[in-house]
Design a protein with these regions (language model features):
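Aromatic-lined glycan-binding groove of carbohydrate-active enzymes
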Residues: 229-283
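Active-site environment of divalent metal-dependent phosphoester hydrolases
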Residues: 54-56, 99-101, 138-141, 167, ...
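Mid-to-C-terminal alpha-helical segments outside catalytic/metal-binding sites
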Residues: 2-45, 49, 56-63, 67-90, ...
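Active-site gating/metal-coordination segments in enzymes
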Residues: 20, 89-232
């Protein structure tokens, strides 16, 4: 698909994509034909729920640095080339929250710029991109208003959030206006952790292995989801839909222990949740991306949550899995309908992609 500079020049003003310069990550995608993903002779629409970006003008409002270690800025042709090579038809763009400590006025300005730029870009290439809105969750009523505007006026398809808000849990009742608005709008929330920053401050995640990411990210997701279950947030907002990055962290693998605590230490639980924690994995409120690392891990996630709760994610531009579509196609034991749902069918329904 050739990309016209005239077509995207206006939309790209102020919008940058992050790329990864982690060394020998394989050859760059060649400018070739767009890969079409086929399952049993049927062309499948593929949707990547987990794709990063940033809006420089928004970051400049609070002097957030753009060139963090290990990142470079790619142009849209690079991104399209990688999508085409991998067989990804759509990316759902999201921005990891770096503004959760900003004052109200700065946060309002930042989010306005950010959401409008995302909407401009997606409008220029509606056949390849949709985007999650951003919001200043540290100011919950403002965040609810920002979300309403972003969805109703700008056409953004959901909301991206962190795994906590400046050290506060998402299950804190102060954030209820945001969950109420998301439920009212019927949109999907994409939750991406920010590396267990409060734990990182202790120094326990220092040293080799990039532990703030390697275990910090899935740990923060596990903590956030557990609080949303045990503090009753999912019960209070039964229409809430959350997709958790990185396969939902450790929760799907250890949810049975969360069930067991209800009977082992009943005096430490309640009055909510209304169901066993393992039921929340399957009951339609929680979704999980496919950033897992073996077919067996994916099969376990699907067993614990149900195939309808699992959605293709690539973590673009970070090369955790260089063949994300083939990763799904190669999982043994799935039906054709299962593969189609994971690759894009479920995400297309949640994000309103025709």
């Amino acid at each position: 698909m050739p990309i016209s500079g005239d077509l995207i020049a206006g939309a790209l003003a102020g919008l940058a994509f992050v790329g990864c310069s982690l060394g020998n990550t394989g050859p760059a995608p060649s400018a070739g034909r767009r890969r079409e993903v086929v399952v049993n002779g049927k062309r499948v629409k593929t949707v990547d729920i987990h794709a990063h970006t940033i809006v420089p003008e928004a970051a400049a409002v609070i002097n957030h640095p753009l060139e963090a270690p290990g990142l470079l800025w790619s142009n849209v042709s690079d991104r399209i080339a990688e999508m085409d090579a991998e067989g990804v038809d759509y990316e759902a763009l999201s921005i990891n929250p770096y503004w959760y400590r900003a004052e109200r006025d700065a946060a309002a300005e930042l989010i306005k710029i950010q959401n409008e730029k995302l909407a401009e870009f997606c409008a220029a290439m509606p056949d390849r991109f949709v985007a999650f809105a951003t919001a200043a969750l540290q100011h919950p009523q403002l965040a609810a208003e920002q979300l309403d505007y972003a969805v109703k006026r700008l056409g953004l398809r959901g909301l991206s959030i962190g795994g906590s808000v400046a050290g506060e849990e998402l299950a804190n009742p102060k954030f209820n206006p945001v969950w109420a608005k998301a439920e009212e709008l019927g949109i999907l929330i994409f939750m991406h952790p920010t590396g267990s920053r409060e734990l990182a401050a202790s120094g326990r995640l220092d040293g080799s292995g990039l532990l703030t990411n390697t275990i910090g990210n899935p740990l923060e997701t596990t903590i956030a989801l557990s609080h949303l279950i045990f503090e009753g947030t999912l019960d209070r907002f039964p229409g809430l839909k959350i997709c958790a990055a990185h396969g939902g962290g450790f929760l799907p693998s250890y949810a049975a222990r969360s069930d067991a605590v209800i009977t082992t230490f009943p005096d430490r639980v309640g009055p909510l949740p209304k169901k066993r924690p393992t039921q929340y994995l399957k009951d339609g409120q929680l979704y999980f991306d496919t950033i897992m690392f073996t077919g067996e891990a994916m099969r376990h996630l699907i067993t614990e949550s149900g195939v309808g709760q699992v959605i293709l994610g690539t973590d673009y531009p970070f090369p955790w899995n260089k063949v994300p579509v083939d990763h799904i196609l190669s999982i043994p034991g799935l039906s054709d309908d299962d593969r189609i749902a994971i690759l894009g069918g479920t995400a297309a329904k949640l994000l309103g992609i025709d």
